[in-house]
């Protein structure tokens, strides 16, 4: 029996994660979507996947809870078996958090939450799931254009994503002998519900940022999802250890 490729997309109950799941499904990939507590949002993602003819399953995952990864890996393995395989082909590390504020307002708890989720969680989830990744599989870590340009009050978030990009390059070297490639996708200003939906809902913010992009607008979630799905395709099988920015030419 021929089994479709299978992807795990973390934080796929909304925003970029949902768009990535749907874009992958459009290309014939089965998708496991995770959420931290928004089961309804995850089910909506499943509905959208099914609407494009895809197949999806839902698992709960708190990316900041590293000790839970062992049981999560077992649950994922059981889902893969239900689909007739033991392999995972694509891991999209999308789940993350952001705390934004000037230097004097950031607390140690804020710092630890962002680093513990975005860096520690991402690293140890890859470590946990590598045994399931097939020869020729891949990891795509979601970063941000803020690792290239600066914006006030984003220091902790952008630093966490810079660490993710460094991890991506190093892990690409470590996992390359197994045929596993690792890349990072760096979205620019995008109209999602991240950070309370500020980019999506604040017309003034969108207009200001649109004026700083080569293409004259902010991005849409579907455009990031398409970029992730394209990077996951066989057509880009020779690409690894790269940071690919998807920003419409923001802040050149």
Predicted features along the sequence, with ranges:
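Short C-terminal tail/terminal secondary-structure segment
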Residues: 149, 229, 236, 240-252
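Active-site helix of classical SDR
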Residues: 126, 160, 168
């Amino acid at each position: 029996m021929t089994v479709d490729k299978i992807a795990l997309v973390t934080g796929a109950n909304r925003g970029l994660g949902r768009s990535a799941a749907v874009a992958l499904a459009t290309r014939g990939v089965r998708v496991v979507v995770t959420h931290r507590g928004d089961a309804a949002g995850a089910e909506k993602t499943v509905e959208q996947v099914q609407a494009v003819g895809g197949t999806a399953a839902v698992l709960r995952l708190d990316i900041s809870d590293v000790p839970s990864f062992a049981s999560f890996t077992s649950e994922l393995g059981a889902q893969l078996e239900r689909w007739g395989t033991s392999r995972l082909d694509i891991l999209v590390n999308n789940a993350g958090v952001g705390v934004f504020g000037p230097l004097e307002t950031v607390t140690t708890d804020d710092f630890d939450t962002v680093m513990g989720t975005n860096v520690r969680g991402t690293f140890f989830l890859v470590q946990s799931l590598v045994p399931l990744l097939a020869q020729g599989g891949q990891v795509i870590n979601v970063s941000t254009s803020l690792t290239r340009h600066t914006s006030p009050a984003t220091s902790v978030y952008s630093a966490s994503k810079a660490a993710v990009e460094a991890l991506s390059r190093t892990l690409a070297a470590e996992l390359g002998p197994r045929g596993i490639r690792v890349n990072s996708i760096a979205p620019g200003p995008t109209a999602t519900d991240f950070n309370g939906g500020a980019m999506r809902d604040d017309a003034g913010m969108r207009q200001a940022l649109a004026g700083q992009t080569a293409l004259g607008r902010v991005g849409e979630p579907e455009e990031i999802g398409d970029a992730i799905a394209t990077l996951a395709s066989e057509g880009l099988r020779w690409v690894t250890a790269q940071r690919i920015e998807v920003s419409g030419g923001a802040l050149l």
